[in-house]
Amino acid sequence: MLPDIQSTKGDGEGESLSWVGMEQIDLPIDIAGRPVSAKVNAGINLLSSPEAEKGIHMSRLYLLLDELTQGEITPALLQHVLKAFLVSHQGRSDEASIEISGDLLLSRKSLNSNHSGWKAYPLTLSAELRQSFTVTLKVGIPYSSTCPASAALSRHVAGLQFSKDFGNRIDRLPAAEIADWLVEKGMPATPHSQRSWAWVDIRLNPEAKSLPVLELIDYAEVALGTAVQTVVKRSDEQAFAVANGQNLMFCEDAARRLNNVFRCASFCEAFDIRVEHQESLHPHNAVARIHWKGSKNVT
């Protein structure tokens, strides 16, 4: 018989450990019907006992993780695997967790032209079995943000330039001449905008039967109105410029928009939202966060 060192008595009178397991395990995962090349962290706690073994049997957890590759990930499947973790270490553990990270690739349509392209959304799916079972889903959504203050300053410059070019003729200008001026000189200053990120971290409703990844992304992109594009023709770029002009946002505005949407989402029991505007004006980022736990929030 081969020696089993892990099953020998540990040092320190069997001191308990809050988490023991493996990180960065490669697994092919199906999330929302899409394949994801995932990195998985999996582990359990180790209870204190005078007769406690030195460590856990990681191979048991590793083999059980293969069940996650046999079909689409659901809350029920995650709970089943976590329960199997505890059964595999009966009497030595009463807590288990799984964390799955990867990029979800989605095909997204252009704003105006009849084209589609692929966009990656980073996500982290976490499941814990302690006194109760909980699932959290965190997704990153890239979008564009145009600064309202910069837009106002740009309009002010345009107004000054208009007055300078036309002086006392303003009241008598033909519409066609104004239109020509707007085309050629109507934008002497442009507001600054930047690629931005919304990180939406939700705790799923316990009654959820599936992972609402697509709904989460769609809710966020509709609320923000300026989702980063994939394939872009000129008509799409113009539509994107219009969308940015109609959705001027400070980071505070973006956070509040998302707050309003996810408070009403039936699949969401609580959330932690972080928005990050990667400023083109500054060498630092503008960030806002909002938490909601069902009855109160802290901004």
Swiss-Prot record:
One of its GO terms (biological process) is tetrahydrofolate biosynthetic process. InterPro entries: GTP_cyclohydrolase_FolE2 (IPR022838), GTP_cyclohydrolase_FolE2/MptA (IPR003801). Its EC number is 3.5.4.16. Pathway: Cofactor biosynthesis; 7,8-dihydroneopterin triphosphate biosynthesis; 7,8-dihydroneopterin triphosphate from GTP: step 1/1. It catalyses: GTP + H2O = 7,8-dihydroneopterin 3'-triphosphate + formate + H(+). The record marks 147 as: May be catalytically important. Keywords: Hydrolase, Plasmid. GO terms for molecular function: GTP cyclohydrolase I activity. Belongs to the GTP cyclohydrolase IV family. Converts GTP to 7,8-dihydroneopterin triphosphate. NCBIfam families: PRK13674.1-1. This is GTP cyclohydrolase FolE2. It comes from Klebsiella pneumoniae. The gene is folE2.
